[in-house]
């Protein structure tokens, strides 16, 4: 088993309590299906933003060649951007994944791509991404070490065109079955931390704190999720800007999920400007 998370997944449980079950200011529909054999997967989503009226959508198809560990993914969105991803996993070595990710914009002819590699084991995970740019690619790298529940991570990016580090981040945390602690420092100026607690089978809570050196702008938030039953959940969160988020998620039937959410400005309650959201998830 390769259970060590990537750098981006550190503190993920706390982030999920804050982010999942909400969709303020939009109507969203997600559709997912796959072939009987599981070799082909299809997904599409559409968003309509209530404040601007702008709509967007995307389509993704995925084809797996399991005997060779290959996965081919095609992506398209309403901005007419085409993406192709080819990944090869667990064949050269257990836990090793190699990926080629390309993007093409037909309207402008713009092309871009990345080469990605990651390797995960029980006590560590490492990875690197390289932009395909002959004028001077940017190299991204990260590493996470795990020991008896403790996690330490480092993330960097190096701009070869300017020969300097453009990102320099550190993280430290602790992970248990029902408790997670995560702290991070980005570029020596941005500090943050989060705490996740699974109180019982029905209640999850999270606290998030962040601040920037040389600034009085401190961000603080509390979030909670409560499972009414196996099909229904309530979510709530509030931050120090007096923004209150409420969410209701109901599984109407297997594969059909409804989400209702609202964002309330507590400082200007009578002035309006609040946002509501509606989401449908369909899976077959």
Swiss-Prot record:
Q: How is it modified after translation?
A: Ubiquitinated by PRKN during mitophagy, leading to its degradation and enhancement of mitophagy. Deubiquitinated by USP30.
Transmembrane segments annotated in the record for this chain: 26-35, 39-48, 55-65, 70-77, 81-90, 96-105, 112-121, 124-131, 138-146, 151-159, 164-176, 179-186, 190-199, 203-212, 219-228, 232-239, 243-252, 255-264, 274-283
- Modified residue Phosphoserine is at which positions? 242
Task: Show which residues constitute the signal peptide.
Answer: none
Q: Which GO terms describe its molecular function?
A: nucleotide binding; porin activity; voltage-gated monoatomic anion channel activity
Q: Does the keyword Cytoplasm apply?
A: no
Indicate the principal place this protein occupies in or around the cell.
Answer: mitochondrion
Q: Which residues carry this modification: Phosphothreonine?
A: 4
Q: Which domain of life is it from?
A: Eukaryota
Spell out the reaction equation it catalyses.
chloride(in) = chloride(out); K(+)(in) = K(+)(out)
Q: Which UniProt keywords apply?
A: Acetylation, Ion transport, Isopeptide bond, Membrane, Mitochondrion, Mitochondrion outer membrane, NAD, Nucleotide-binding, Phosphoprotein, Porin, Transmembrane, Transmembrane beta strand, Transport, Ubl conjugation
| Binding residues for NAD(+) | 243-245, 261-265
**Modification sites for N-acetylcysteine:** 2
An example of a Gene Ontology cellular component annotation for this protein is: pore complex
Q: Where does it localize?
A: Mitochondrion outer membrane; Membrane
What is one GO biological process annotated to this record? sperm mitochondrial sheath assembly
Modification type N6-acetyllysine: residues: 12, 15, 20, 91, 267
Q: Which CDD domains match?
A: Porin3_VDAC (cd07306)
* NAD listed as a keyword: yes
Record cross-link Glycyl lysine isopeptide (Lys-Gly) (interchain with G-Cter in ubiquitin), residues: 54, 110-111, 267
Family, according to the entry, reads as follows: Belongs to the eukaryotic mitochondrial porin family.
Any notes on this protein's domains?
Consists mainly of a membrane-spanning beta-barrel formed by 19 beta-strands.
What this protein is reported to do is described as: Non-selective voltage-gated ion channel that mediates the transport of anions and cations through the mitochondrion outer membrane and plasma membrane. Forms a high-conducting channel with a stable open state and a voltage-induced closure with a mild preference for anions over cations. Involved in male fertility and sperm mitochondrial sheath formation.
Q: Which PANTHER family match?
A: VOLTAGE-DEPENDENT ANION-SELECTIVE CHANNEL (PTHR11743), VOLTAGE-DEPENDENT ANION-SELECTIVE CHANNEL PROTEIN 3 (PTHR11743:SF28)
How it assembles, according to the record, is: Interacts with ARMC12 in a TBC1D21-dependent manner. Interacts with MISFA.
Protein name, per record: Non-selective voltage-gated ion channel VDAC3
Q: Its encoding gene is what?
A: VDAC3
């Amino acid at each position: 088993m390769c259970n060590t998370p990537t750098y981006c997944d550190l503190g993920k449980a706390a982030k999920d309590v804050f982010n999942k079950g909400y969709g303020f200011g939009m109507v969203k529909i997600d559709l997912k299906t796959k072939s009987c054999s599981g070799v082909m997967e299809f997904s599409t989503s559409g968003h309509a933003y209530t404040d601007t009226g702008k709509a967007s959508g995307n389509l993704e198809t995925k084809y797996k060649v399991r005997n060779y560990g290959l996965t081919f993914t095609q992506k398209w969105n309403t901005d007419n951007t085409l993406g192709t991803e080819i990944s090869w996993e667990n064949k050269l070595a257990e836990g090793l994944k190699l990926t080629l990710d390309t993007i093409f914009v037909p309207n402008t002819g713009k092309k871009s791509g990345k080469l990605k590699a990651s390797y995960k084991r029980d006590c560590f995970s490492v990875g690197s991404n390289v932009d395909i740019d002959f004028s001077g690619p940017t190299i991204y790298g990260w590493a996470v070490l795990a020991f008896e529940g403790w996690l330490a991570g480092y993330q960097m990016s190096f701009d070869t065109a300017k020969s300097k580090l453009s990102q320099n981040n550190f993280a430290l945390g602790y992970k248990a079955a029902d408790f997670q602690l995560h702290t991070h420092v980005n570029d020596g100026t941005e500090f943050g931390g989060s705490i996740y607690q699974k109180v019982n089978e029905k209640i999850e809570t999270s606290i998030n704190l962040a601040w920037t050196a040389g600034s009085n702008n401190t961000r603080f938030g509390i979030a909670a999720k409560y499972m009414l039953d196996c099909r229904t959940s309530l979510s709530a969160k509030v931050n120090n800007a007096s923004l209150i988020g409420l969410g209701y998620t109901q599984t109407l039937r297997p594969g059909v999920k409804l989400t209702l959410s609202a964002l309330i400005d507590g400082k200007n309650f009578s002035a309006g400007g609040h946002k509501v959201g509606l989401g449908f998830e369909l899976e077959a």
